[in-house]
């Protein structure tokens, strides 16, 4: 399990860097470039979806060439380029280009990193392993957000955004240095010379494919987190306090990720996933109708609980029910399907907000989450597989 901690530390430093700037993006777009919620949603949707198309191919290359560490390193290295692109951006189009670069890196690194976590886990403890990784990942996010908050809070105005973009390069570099500690499991290259990866996907258990469709359905209502930040600002929080709320969310998810992973090892992944979808529905209904600041803080805490229940547990579930020789491909396929859904999700959310007001995208997301929970529950009753068949 030691390798899991090293992989987690790579994500820890990378997320300090990323989350120093991520919650600032919607605020920066609105304040500096006059972007509307619809435009912000479109930018986030394009960035997430275009990059996510790479995830399944990245997973396929991981399975074929067994060069997980090299592929993951190249993805994390893209984070440095992203920060430089933010510094140089002179319009909302420049921010869009930077976000696409960032998400391309995530698309490249996600599948090989998750395979390394899965392979490094103690038998029977995949949930715990992914929980440890997610906990370190979210801890880095929380620290990055806190650093951004402190710089903005104690700054004198003017150039704090640019200052944060520059400082974020430091932890991005540290994440790359941590790769020297990771030991990759040596495997023989799998010879799949001319066979398209989707041909293997066709042979998978139909219930596994149905689960991926459930994830797609859920994601259509799970728009970018920037809408949570914009919603918090709409009820009266200033920019620095909005960032602090995002810190609370990440800190909560970090603290609860390992207990959630351990819980899934004991009671099963599917039960926790259904419960997570239900928590999400409660949170989104809350974001739709709550106007009191104190209750908004509670919602960010509950959103952290949802993330802890879903993120690591879902990856552990996919890695366990996928055939061993297609583990990277399936993790990548899942990420791609989710990413493709993010473009319409964020675009729909932006349009709903603009046309019908702030509550509309959250009601839409909550309803789709309830539907996804129902479908997943019915799949469980039908015997959704717990382990893979090769």
Model-derived regions, located:
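Juxtamembrane intracellular "pre-TM" segments in multi-pass secondary transporters
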Residues: 1, 184-214
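Transmembrane alpha-helix termini and helix-breaking/packing motifs in multi-pass membrane transporters
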Residues: 27-32, 143-160, 344-360
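Glycine-rich segments within core transmembrane alpha-helices of 12-TM secondary carriers
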Residues: 131-148, 335-345
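Structural signature of the two symmetry-related core transmembrane helices
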Residues: 70-84, 169, 271-286, 366
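Cytoplasmic helix-loop-helix junction between adjacent transmembrane helices
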Residues: 98-139, 317
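Helix-to-loop junctions at the C-terminal end of transmembrane segments
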Residues: 54-66, 152, 256-268, 353
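C-terminal membrane-cytosol helix-exit motif in multi-pass small-molecule transporters
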Residues: 169-189, 372-380
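Helix-loop boundary and gating motifs at the non-cytosolic
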Residues: 1-51, 207-245
